[in-house]
Amino acid sequence: MTNIRKTHPLMKIINNSFIDLPTPSNISSWWNFGSLLGICLIIQILTGLFLAMHYTSDTLTAFSSVTHICRDVNYGWLIRYLHANGASMFFICLFLHVGRGLYYGSYLFLETWNIGVLLLFAVMATAFMGYVLPWGQMSFWGATVITNLLSAIPYIGSDLVQWIWGGFSVDKATLTRFFAFHFILPFIVAALAGVHLLFLHETGSNNPSGLSSDADKIPFHPYYTIKDILGALMLILILMMLVLFSPDLLGDPDNYTPANPLNTPPHIKPEWYFLFAYAILRSIPNKLGGVLALVLSILVLAFMPLLHTSKQRSMMFRPLSQCLFWILVADLIILTWIGGQPVEHPFIIIGQLASILYFMLILILMPLVSLFENNLMKW
């Protein structure tokens, strides 16, 4: 009798992706984040669905509907904080996943990498629109400031902004369309993640050494299923600790004040996971220049395969490149800190220096050091 797992059209896809998939025997815990991102996405879609059942996307009732969810709906507070902090966990996993890709040269899988960059943009767009929905002060002013950046586009800018707003300011039309997009985008993200996986399974996984692992593959199940379950339990533990002990740790207190177009908060800032990009945006005194730098801060990832000058794929055996990589990580942490600070001395100059260093490291220093390491190998 033939095994249904290997013959049934649907089961066959699952089998070849999660059960009999030949996997390198030496992939470390850094390879856990793909599955963790999948779990995060499922958590976000499920909690979001239940929140949408009680939420109203109207400027007059949005804020009070969120309050109603927290106070009157059974376990509404849990669903709301799982969704809010789930987004933070999502981005932590995303940053670590991208960092792993940069460190081990996974970006040389071109299709997988490019869809990954597209996924990053899609998730960032989803998170931004989700932050607008509670209609607190930071929701309203964050939406106003970020959408206004599009007015820097020459000629069509101001028309484009009004088209997105659906009027002359962020209002009911804006909130309604943001809710609609926030609902549909995660499903697009899920579809893209499927394509991401499809392309990955065309080539097989990379591994820490960056060398071919064809000679030493093991089945995904049970070895990596059990490893992924351990990762998932750790993720859920951290998420539940956040949700149950300090649910507002990563939020902004200003968002507990209903949106008021007549009163601007002293410091407008996005959620913590956008602060590094926000710091880069603010470090350039010109509006259009700032917007370009903001987009490039993420889009620069798409150029990584072109900037790869080393003869080795991974950084595992390249100590100089490792040094620069960890300087880049430290630089991103500094940018995140600066993004949350007021625009005054010394934060302005620190932000500008950190922004310059960010682009210099990726575009100039790392490719040059890789070439230098190639020459060192000849000795």
Swiss-Prot record:
* Positions annotated to bind heme b b566: H97, H196
- Output the Gene Ontology cellular-component terms: mitochondrial inner membrane; respiratory chain complex III
| Main location class | mitochondrion
Cofactor: binding comment: Binds 2 heme b groups non-covalently.
Which residues are recorded as binding a ubiquinone?
H201
- State the annotated membrane topology for this chain: Multi-pass membrane protein
Q: Where are the transmembrane segments?
A: 33-53, 77-98, 113-133, 178-198, 226-246, 288-308, 320-340, 347-367
Name the GO terms of the biological process aspect.
mitochondrial electron transport, ubiquinol to cytochrome c
Q: Which family does it belong to?
A: Belongs to the cytochrome b family.
Q: Quaternary structure per UniProt? A: The cytochrome bc1 complex contains 11 subunits: 3 respiratory subunits (MT-CYB, CYC1 and UQCRFS1), 2 core proteins (UQCRC1 and UQCRC2) and 6 low-molecular weight proteins (UQCRH/QCR6, UQCRB/QCR7, UQCRQ/QCR8, UQCR10/QCR9, UQCR11/QCR10 and a cleavage product of UQCRFS1). This cytochrome bc1 complex then forms a dimer.
> Under what name is this protein listed?
Cytochrome b
